[in-house]
């Protein structure tokens, strides 16, 4: 998943915080979030 995190360091920090907060979320949801962010 880390490979998919592209953008500024500040943006990546925000995404990492969200991933940590959502650590209990299933993997499909995380992939969906990352895919949506990458396509934005």
Curated annotation (Swiss-Prot):
Reported modifications of this chain: The N-terminus is blocked.
Keyword Transcription regulation tagged: no
Gene3D superfamilies: Annexin
Protein's cellular compartments: Cytoplasm; Melanosome
Principal subcellular localization: cytoplasm
One GO CC term on file: melanosome
Domain of life per record: Eukaryota
Keyword annotations from UniProtKB, A to Z: Annexin, Calcium, Calcium/phospholipid-binding, Cytoplasm, Repeat
Molecular function terms from GO: calcium ion binding; calcium-dependent phospholipid binding
Start-end of each Annexin repeat: 1-4, 21-40
Tissue specificity note: In the lung, expressed by alveolar endothelial cells. Not expressed in tracheal endothelium or alveolar macrophages.
Domain notes: A pair of annexin repeats may form one binding site for calcium and phospholipid.
Similarity field: Belongs to the annexin family.
Function recorded in the entry: May associate with CD21. May regulate the release of Ca(2+) from intracellular stores.
Other remarks on this protein: Seems to bind one calcium ion with high affinity.
Name of the protein: Annexin A6
Organism listed in the record: Oryctolagus cuniculus
Encoding gene (name): ANXA6
């Amino acid at each position: 998943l880390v490979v998919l995190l592209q953008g500024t360091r500040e943006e990546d920090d925000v995404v990492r915080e969200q991933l940590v907060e959502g650590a209990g979320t299933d993997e499909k949801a995380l992939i969906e979030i990352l895919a949506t962010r990458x396509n934005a």
